[in-house]
Amino acid sequence: MSWLFGLNKGQQGPPSVPGFPEPPSPPGGSGDGGDKNKPKDKWSNFDPTGLERAAKAARELDQSRHAKEALNLAKVQEETLQLEQQSKIKEYEAAVEQLKNEQIRVQAEERRKTLNEETKQHQARAQYQDKLARQRYEDQLRQQQLQNEENLRRQEESVQKQEAMRKATVEHEMELRHKNEMLRIEAEARARAKVERENADIIRENIRLKAAEHRQTVLESIKTAGTVFGEGFRAFISDWDKVTATVAGLSLLAVGIYTAKNATGVAGRYIEARLGKPSLVRDTSRFTVAEAVKHPVKISKRLLSKIQDALEGVILSPKLEERVRDIAIATRNTKANKGLYRNILMYGPPGTGKTLFAKKLAMHSGMDYAIMTGGDVAPMGREGVTAMHKVFDWAGTSKRGLLLFVDEADAFLRKRSTEKISEDLRATLNAFLYRTGEQSNKFMLVLASNQPEQFDWAINDRIDEIVHFDLPGLEERERLVRLYFDKYVLQPASEGKQRLKVAQFDYGKKCSDLAQLTEGMSGREISKLGVAWQAAAYASEDGILNEAMIDARVADAIRQHQQKMEWLKAEGKENAAKESGKNPLQPLLEGTPV
């Protein structure tokens, strides 16, 4: 509306309104349009009332006192419209720019797709060309291989032909040479035969002369040798001094050989009895010359060691401890007074301290000890008798007295009436009975067995005292647990030299609890528990033995002990079943005293 109030004079006229028609052309215009393009027809329906109302409203607005405000309002509206138009133009321009950018992006995308497609086409073309090249190369290799094979075949055929020709040539040459050789040999044989026929009388004469000369030479040699030997023997016989000296020399030579042979045997047996160790002896406190040279410090300590307590390190029940202490005191006094030693039988379950007490008894009494096992006797066969005599001969040479400890004695000291014993073992048993028939002041016999009822009756007759080693009770088990816990755990941990530490818990209470849990276990099984605790600590990551690890090892040991007991019960049932099928008179026929 600004043009209506005379504003924006420098601008163009009002814009054309689409709803209003164009003004009529002047009458002098061209009449090409005909009658239907006349102004009369075009403006015949025009209504000017609208323009009149607009003009009237403009006059009223000019005359109004609010004309200035209306003018300002119109200006503001015009500016607002212009700003809206400019914003629309900017939006249009932004849309155009966006469209251009979109077109550029689309073109770039199309170009990228085109490049990708071209790249794919190039790659496909390159792959196809490479495939063709590979095929051509493979075909060339195949052709070359076929050609090489053909050349090789031809070469082989040529070589075979040459070899055949060479072989034929050599065969022909050998055949010709053979023919020539046969002809030469035939000619030589004919010539030799002709010469021999012509010289037959001369050859026979030469042979006759050579034989006569050889016979004459042999006869002269025999005559000369007989004359020499005859004169020498005659001269020897005629000189009685030479005859006497010769006989004496031969006699002395025979006596020297016999004496040296027997003296060597006697000296060897003496050295073996004094210095050697019998093959049946597994362990002994007596030392040989070789051991003294090899371990001088150990032997010196043993010689300078003081007499130990017989029950040091041995944990037994009070009643049994009192009895074995009496045995130790009696044995020591017997040695001091040079009396006769008493033979002892110790029986009981395995691992109850029989072997340990035997060693302690020997040390307490100031005696030497020797340990042999019954299982070593049976495999020796016929050598068992000799080996048994060597053991007792060796025992009799001890100046300090010898405690001979036979572990698992029931392995060879069985009843002689049973059919299971062999003749060699029976002879060895008889030798043992012969050497132990009387009391001795040289050695003390200590037998250990888990099944003393299998002993021959003569063995029982040679036993002076029987000691039963039973499984440890609650108090003894607690002492054993404390002993081995201190030996295998606390002492290595306190020394600090080994990778072993102990966690903080009540050791005394734990040992008491373990003693209650280990009911029925032997001392050896409890000692193995101590070793198991030490091994568990070494196997841990930090080397610390805690209470849980101890309980785990104890539970495992209890489970193993129960399994062993089940096996023992099953074995007892089998033996009972076998015993029930025996002859009821068999016990009356077994063994008689010797």
Curated annotation (Swiss-Prot):
GO terms for cellular component: mitochondrial inner membrane; mitochondrial nucleoid. The gene is atad3. This is ATPase family AAA domain-containing protein 3. CDD domains: RecA-like_ATAD3-like. Residues 51-213 form a coiled coil. ATP binds at G348, P349, P350, G351, T352, G353, K354, T355. Residues 33-44, 571-581 have a biased composition (Basic and acidic residues). The chain crosses the membrane at residues 243-260. It comes from Xenopus tropicalis (Western clawed frog). Residues 15-27 have a biased composition (Pro residues). It is found in: Mitochondrion inner membrane; Mitochondrion matrix, Mitochondrion nucleoid.
